[in-house]
Amino acid sequence: MVERRNPLVLSSTRSTLRSVLNSSQPSSADGDRVLNKDGDLLRGNARLSAGILRWRKDGENVSDAKLDSLDDSALVGLSTQLLKRLSINSGSLVVVKNIEIGIQRVAQVVVLDPPKTTLEDASLTQVPVSDSLHTMLVFPTYDLMGQQLLDQEVAYLSPMLAFNLSLHISCLKSLVHRGNGVLEKYFEAKCDEEFIGKSAEDGSKIGLDLEPVSQVPGYASHLRVSFVKIPECGTIPSLKVNSSFEAEERQGLIDSALQKYFGTDRQLSRGDIFRIYIDWNCGSSICNPCSQRLCSESDDYIYFKVIAMEPSNERFLRVNHSQTALVLGGTVSSGLPPDLLVYRSKVPMPLQEETVNILASVLSPPLCPSALASKLRVAVLLHGIPGCGKRTVVKYVARRLGLHVVEFSCHSLLASSERKTSTALAQTFNMARRYSPTILLLRHFDVFKNLGSQDGSLGDRVGVSFEIASVIRELTEPVSNGDSSMEEKSNSNFSENEVGKFRGHQVLLIASAESTEGISPTIRRCFSHEIRMGSLNDEQRSEMLSQSLQGVSQFLNISSDEFMKGLVGQTSGFLPRDLQALVADAGANLYISQESETKKINSLSDDLHGVDIHQASQIDNSTEKLTAKEDFTKALDRSKKRNASALGAPKVPNVKWDDVGGLEDVKTSILDTVQLPLLHKDLFSSGLRKRSGVLLYGPPGTGKTLLAKAVATECSLNFLSVKGPELINMYIGESEKNVRDIFEKARSARPCVIFFDELDSLAPARGASGDSGGVMDRVVSQMLAEIDGLSDSSQDLFIIGASNRPDLIDPALLRPGRFDKLLYVGVNADASYRERVLKALTRKFKLSEDVSLYSVAKKCPSTFTGADMYALCADAWFQAAKRKVSKSDSGDMPTEEDDPDSVVVEYVDFIKAMDQLSPSLSITELKKYEMLRDQFQGRSS
């Protein structure tokens, strides 16, 4: 049965109503109507949960005229039952209070009729919060254009009203108290729809008090507003111009937008933030941050802050351009709403999710008002190799928290006098305070490790470091409750809770560096947290490449999955910056190729009259796809060359088992060590220490290096080759640092094989080197420390060493857990073994029919190594090439069966080459290596 509406009480019936209700006792229950001292009817209060109200201006169900009449900065949506409970109508004004913080604002009520529900079906009108959409994990969300059910115990606020009530602070505080797991989900969120079905605990609800306004606020006679400073552009949007004419035009757009905005009554208070929409584009060639900014819903909004209103003794006032004189001028610092609060964010979460979660857990608590947070000093040192995405992570976290980001390069802070560096650093903090609350991002912070190096005095270096540390420590302290800015003091009508919004941590310091090594301990102690960022793993690279290549995958002549798998394997160790450069390079080459192919098709269609251009494009379709793949491969090769370093860049060699002749026993032993942990990781998940080190020893030229490359190729591993002398440096500590860098580079390119060639020169027995500084002893100790960390089954890192003299290597490297698997790679006197080696070396040769590799192998000396047989094959091919050149010079005409570009190697060429070649090993030397094999045979396993 439909409930009867309450009678409308008019002023003329006041005396009659007083006489009727004079004998009744007024009720104090929430939601009941009571009488004030004058006998007027009072409407009840309501305590509700906070929600977010959204609508799309391009929707089909609501006209633009109706949307324009709504005050999006002060709007609250209620159900019909709540309107009856409060005895108000749609369009009435209510006072909304954040119970936790105590901030109050006046808002206009709009009724939200539940779609697809009727009053007869009362059970459907009560929908739990957990079954609705959620904003910021906490706020139930209602979309005017949607068809979801309505929660009867929720007041749905417009995003700007929620921000002015500091509900985002209450939400963040709730998430922090619920633990890091919930906080991580908040920073992973991309849109409201991700939280369908998420349970909302009772403790996570944000409480509101709603009270009908007994008297409509009066009009403000004067209103003063200022632009909110945005450090990304360095200035307000109206000044992002190239000429005075353009500046006047843009200022006119802002004035007209404000005139239209205040064409309807707006409920404002001092300190409120409101925004206007202007459809424009910066277009300035000097504004790089604007040109690089992602396109999103918030780019066309300009934010303003209410500085002063008249009359000043009124807390809430109405503003209308026909009743209020508007003064616009200056800029002011203020935070902006978090991106998830005001719109559905289109910015994807960075690939380094772990770093995002750690940084969020550090920066979120200081933003929550509490006695403990106001005493904590927060400063973060974020370090990682250049291009790993440090700035991207910082900006993403700042958007989620509603903070500005002010960037400075520490190179610009280094003055001619190092004593002035601390002064320049203090000025950057003062600059950042102009945009508070903000994150001050000091890039290239590791330049401070060179302070005082010119003077060379230890006392001067300590003094400069102490000055830098004093500035950081002093300026990262939170503002005490006794401190306040001039702006806060002038706004004496603010409540104590509202003033508290502008105190606390005005500037949060984040310093980014490539490495923390070399930075003075005095400076490092100023940072409360140090966070390290690594490189991308296979899944992260695959995700980034998939997103980047969505538009060009149709041009590739192989399936997307197959191409992506190979590309991910070839980009091991690539950073986000490297991947972006790779895709940009390939895209530029692909565009040029497509342009040239289009010209060919057009010329072909002109020559073939009557043939359609589409048909002509089908003729050359396969060529286009092949060209696109080749362009991408070339871009990958160029990218690898750019990333190559002095110590060698990780790469995947192109050496197959077919290139290695013989050595079947050694192949099997290496595969058991390397391939088994990769294919069956579950077997090693129980904590068993895997054997990840192999030492190949034997005479030179027996194929130790070739064997290591073949293992890396067949197991799809990256290959990092290290020559011993490359790591030795004359400066103290640099050699050990080079060893650490090698293992760090390999970890970033996992799965990876580190190949130490000539290991005996890099890690000789300690105490026997005789160098005055003990450099080699420290290098060996550093290698032992790094290798001991490879036993973890999750490392996917393997080490292979090669040496001619294993007896010179430090014995500690040969114990189990390090280079514990010793494999002898020697010379085999069996003719069939040498035949397999010759087949591998000549598999790309064009041999004559009279060539018998077994006969050639039998004629080879018994001390021939793999290198000797490679020289034999190379000399034989050279003999055949000279014979072909001689025939060409003599004028002999080749037969039809002969290929003019091929060289045919005959049996006699091998014999001539063998006569001119002597073995690289003698019988005596070979016996010495066999004695070494017998000595270490007991350690072989």
From Swiss-Prot:
Q: Which residues form the signal peptide?
A: none
The record's comment on protein family reads:
Belongs to the AAA ATPase family.
Q: State if Nuclease is listed as a keyword.
A: no
What's the name of the protein?
Answer: Peroxisomal ATPase PEX6
Question: Top enzyme class of this protein?
Answer: hydrolase
Subcellular compartments: Cytoplasm, Cytosol; Peroxisome membrane
Q: Which reaction does it catalyse?
A: ATP + H2O = ADP + phosphate + H(+)
